[in-house]
Amino acid sequence: MARYEEVSVSGFEEFHRAVEQHNGKTIFAYFTGSKDAGGKSWCPDCVQAEPVVREGLKHISEGCVFIYCQVGEKPYWKDPNNDFRKNLKVTAVPTLIKYGTPQKLVESECLQANLVEMLFSED
């Protein structure tokens, strides 16, 4: 059995539903540019950060939930009124957060294995 549960979602509504379904659990969320049919994100920083974040998951506490959230295509993401920007204050991708706390890593911070590991391992 996995130490943690991973949920993959696309868009704000699916993210919101996933959070509601896992209410009461420690939730980490990784926001990334959406991928095309070939599995490639429009966000080059997200492509670089994903293996670092995946490696960091080895340090996540048992029973936590990891939500992998594709934020949409670039034009939607760049809209200052999109729900991620307005409701979650996620202003850049990639972003890794501990949901419900001020703890987050943004852009190049997601490339630093020590920071990713620290975020996942803090209680």
Curated annotation (Swiss-Prot):
Keyword Cytoplasm: yes
UniProt entry tagged with the keyword Acetylation: yes
Active site residues according to the UniProt entry: C43 (nucleophile), C46 (nucleophile)
Name this protein carries in UniProt: Thioredoxin domain-containing protein 17
Keywords: Acetylation, Cytoplasm, Disulfide bond, Redox-active center
PTM: The oxidized protein is reduced by TRXR1.
Broad class of the protein's primary localization: cytoplasm
Site (Contributes to redox potential value): P44, D45
Biological process terms in GO annotation: tumor necrosis factor-mediated signaling pathway
Domain of life, source organism: Eukaryota
Family stated for the protein in its record: Belongs to the thioredoxin family.
UniProt cross-references to SUPFAM superfamilies, sorted A to Z: Thioredoxin-like
GO molecular function: peroxidase activity; protein-disulfide reductase [NAD(P)H] activity
Entry-annotated residues carrying N-acetylalanine: A2
Complex formation: Interacts with TRXR1 and DYNLL1/DNCL1.
Subcellular location: Cytoplasm
InterPro entries: Thioredoxin-like_sf, TXNDC17-like, TXNDC17_dom
